[in-house]
Each structure stands twice: as C-alpha cells, then as structure tokens.
C-alpha cells in the first residue's frame, strides 16, 4: 500500500536511489498504489553525475511492496521493501538493468520490458 509521502527504493540503474511519492496515478482521488501502479515521485537521493538529479519529478511503476498482494489462486506474496522502477512517458524503463525480484502482476499490467529485464519474477 503505497500512498502520498511514501519513500521507495529504486530497483534500476537510472541513477536515483530513493523516491518520495507525490501522487498515485489512476482513478478519482486514488489513495493507495500497489504492484503495477504508476506513481509520480520526487527524487530524494541520487548518485552523482547521473541522468537523474535530486529534486527531479519522475514517473515510476511499483515493482515490490511490503504489504502482501492476494492472488486469484488464494496465495499471498510480499517483499522485504517498497521499490519502484523509473519509466518514461511511453512506460518503458529508463534504466538498463533491474535489481531484485519483481512481482508477476507486472506482466498482467503490460510492463513486459521490466519483466524481461528482471533477474527473478515471483
């Protein structure tokens, strides 16, 4: 459950390290985001000399949440951290590598490029 002011780790090599959520995209007054939702974020930490700078406003897709996700077969999945991957306006990842596992729900939401770059899909 990702909401406004939530801090997210960045799971790619775009240059950002920490993000703070400004808004969850979708719906009318959508309060919470989960895996596969797009969020507008502010970069709070970034590595030097990277494409992304501290204070930049970026779009990202949530790939991991600490709050469990219920699947249609009745199983639940949760991760150790809240993480996102930066995306451009065409929903393609800005980085070239993805770190850590991502949820299978991304495939259903249409983020096939992120799923193909990820080392593990749970």
Curated annotation (Swiss-Prot):
CC terms in the record's Gene Ontology section: cytosolic large ribosomal subunit
Q: Which Pfam families match?
A: Ribosomal_L14
Under InterPro entries, the record lists:
Ribosomal_uL14, Ribosomal_uL14_bac-type, Ribosomal_uL14_CS, Ribosomal_uL14_sf
Can you supply a Gene Ontology BP term from the record? translation
Family per record: Belongs to the universal ribosomal protein uL14 family.
Alphabetized, the UniProt keywords read: Ribonucleoprotein, Ribosomal protein, RNA-binding, rRNA-binding
Q: Which PROSITE patterns match?
A: RIBOSOMAL_L14
Q: What is its quaternary makeup?
A: Part of the 50S ribosomal subunit. Forms a cluster with proteins L3 and L19. In the 70S ribosome, L14 and L19 interact and together make contacts with the 16S rRNA in bridges B5 and B8.
Q: Name one GO molecular function term.
A: large ribosomal subunit rRNA binding
Task of the protein: Binds to 23S rRNA. Forms part of two intersubunit bridges in the 70S ribosome.
What CDD domains does this protein's entry cite?
Ribosomal_uL14
Q: Give the protein name, as stated in the record.
A: Large ribosomal subunit protein uL14
Q: Origin, by domain of life?
A: Bacteria
